């Protein structure tokens, strides 16, 4: 005959086995950005604001139109961050000739806080290629 203590022990063991056998709750996939988002960035004393409009292109892909600096850019979800890497051009501040640049942009899939880095691909004036032209922290906020 099993006493009260035996029943409690058996109950505890069954509960433990059940808990161990239960798979962890799956985390929901981050929301794919869609529609307009407010973009704000602080770079030294200057602040920048714009609207980025996202169009999903898959479960881990979204394209953005964001003023002249970032058009038709595809972001891909990687390790909890939306990431984009591409090329563009800007005027060399020394002689005002077109200067090819690389752009690396990423933001956290949950907080929407991100970083943007632009670097030169060719020399500009006396500066070497590969110099960082700008690095900004930014925040996206879903509009509407």
Model-derived segments and their meaning:
Residues 1-28:
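Secretory targeting and sorting signals
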Residues 2-3, 30, 42-45, 89-95, ...:
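Extracytoplasmic/secretory-pathway segments with low complexity and glycosylation-like composition
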Residues 30-50, 112-117, 136, 140-142:
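Tryptophan-anchored aromatic micro-motifs
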Residues 30-39, 58-64, 78-87, 110-113:
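Short, hydrophobic/aromatic-rich segments at coil-to-beta transitions
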Residues 45-83, 118-119, 123:
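N-terminal glycine/threonine-rich, aromatic-flanked beta-hairpin/loop signature
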Residues 47, 93-102, 130-137:
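Amphipathic hydrophobic-ligand
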Residues 67-111, 144:
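Contiguous, well-ordered beta-strand patches that form the walls/edges
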Residues 118-144:
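Edge beta-strand at a domain terminus
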């Amino acid at each position: 005959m099993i006493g009260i203590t035996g029943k409690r022990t058996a109950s505890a063991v069954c509960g433990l086995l059940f808990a161990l056998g239960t798979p962890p709750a799956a985390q929901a996939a981050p929301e794919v950005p869609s529609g307009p988002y407010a973009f704000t960035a602080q770079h030294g004393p200057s602040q920048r604001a714009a609207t980025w409009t996202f169009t999903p292109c898959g479960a881990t892909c979204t394209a953005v139109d964001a003023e002249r600096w970032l058009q038709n850019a595809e972001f891909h979800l990687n390790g909890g961050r939306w990431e984009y890497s591409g090329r563009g051009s800007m005027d060399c501040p020394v002689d005002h000739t077109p200067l090819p640049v690389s752009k690396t942009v990423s933001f956290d899939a949950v907080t929407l806080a991100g970083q943007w880095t632009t670097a030169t691909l060719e020399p500009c004036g006396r500066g070497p290629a590969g110099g960082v032209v700008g690095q900004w922290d930014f925040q996206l906020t879903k509009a509407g």
